[in-house]
Regions:
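Active-site-proximal helix-loop elements at catalytic-domain edges
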Residues: 1-29
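A short glycine/serine-rich beta->alpha loop
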Residues: 5-12, 42-51, 122-130
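Short cysteine clusters
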Residues: 17, 53, 101
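Phosphate-handling active-site elements
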Residues: 28-38, 65-87
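Active-site nucleophile and cofactor-binding loops and adjacent substrate-binding regions
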Residues: 36, 51-55
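DPxDG-like acidic metal-binding loop motif
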Residues: 58-66
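C-terminal binding/interaction regions
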Residues: 82-134
Length: 134
């Protein structure tokens, strides 16, 4: 199964977008599925505030684990992680128009009305999986 397929599969199990992306890469990141699910659990729905999309924060966690700064003196790691962060976020915004959850979904998911809009328009089941699969 590809990473995209894994992420969509996790998301279809009612996991947060951030959990789905991070768990799809758990093996490559040297963490367990449980660790990935726990680490990503507070980042879904733009950290439950409609802010940065959980698929983006999940991807940033993956990039941090793969390329991140390993110590205070690891300036190369810091520079590399900054570079891959900017590259990923810029590409996501270019492809999707934004990396803000509320902007992507076209509503305020923190409100009852916004959440209802997403459910009624199948955004969580049809639109969000597209974010998972990049």
């Amino acid at each position: 199964m590809t990473h995209k397929e894994k992420a969509v599969n996790y998301f279809s199990q009612k996991l947060h977008c951030s959990q789905a992306v991070l768990a799809a890469f758990a093996d490559e990141c040297g963490i367990t599925e449980e660790e990935a699910l726990r680490l990503g659990s507070c980042f879904g729905g733009g950290m439950r505030k409609g802010e940065v999309c959980g698929a983006v924060t999940g991807a940033l966690m993956v990039l941090g684990l793969l390329y991140g700064q390993k110590s205070a003196g690891d300036t190369e790691g810091r520079q590399l992680s900054n570079k891959v962060n900017d590259l990923m976020m810029d590409r996501f915004k270019e492809k999707c128009g934004s990396y803000i959850c509320n902007d992507l979904l076209g509503c305020d998911i923190t409100s009852a009305e916004g959440h209802k809009y997403c459910v009624n328009n199948k955004l969580f089941t049809e639109f969000c999986p597209k974010m998972e699969s990049g």
